[in-house]
Amino acid sequence: MLQTTLKYRNRCNICVREYKCCIGSFMSRFGLSNMALTHYLTSIIHSFTSLAHQMLKRTNQDLPTPVKYYNPEIAKEYKKIEAAAEQKLLSMLPEEFQEDFRPFVISQQTSEEEAQIVKQADSICAYLKCLEELSAGNHEFALAKKRLDITLAERKTPEMDYFLNTFAPSFELSLDEIS
């Protein structure tokens, strides 16, 4: 199915309909342009799991990590909210797709390896955001970058090293350096 969907650029990558399906209209309604960069970067690693992950973040208005994990009770309750949102997102798919996409949408059914890949991609996206902001002179992201340096070191893999060494430096370039 993935090979078939790649040739339809103006269509939903999930069901190959012209953005009139539940996911296509959902993405349009909640701001595809706001999530396009993050989704693209995350989808380099794993497209379907990252799509569900980003959709849930968008619909739940993802909490900043320090807030989400400050108190274990907050984290526990937020997991319940995420689980309910996952079920809602899955139910929005046409019935004929639900079983196929269940492992990609319902985090409890995602393999440990896929969950780790999504966490890595999410950390990389946050790190790249910090690089962009710091490059633009916004020093409010300095502490977040320090925390993410630690997180990235903990989640380090050869693939992450390659991505960070090859692509991350470009996120620190100024507009003049890019042109």
Swiss-Prot record:
It catalyses: a 2'-deoxyribonucleoside 5'-phosphate + H2O = a 2'-deoxyribonucleoside + phosphate. It is found in: Cytoplasm. One of its GO terms (cellular component) is cytoplasm. GO terms for molecular function: 5'-deoxynucleotidase activity; metal ion binding; nucleotide binding. Belongs to the 5DNU family. Its cofactor is a divalent metal cation. It comes from Vibrio vulnificus (strain CMCP6). It holds the Pfam family YfbR-like. The lineage of its organism: Bacteria, Pseudomonadati, Pseudomonadota, Gammaproteobacteria, Vibrionales. This is 5'-deoxynucleotidase VV1_0013. Catalyzes the strictly specific dephosphorylation of 2'-deoxyribonucleoside 5'-monophosphates.
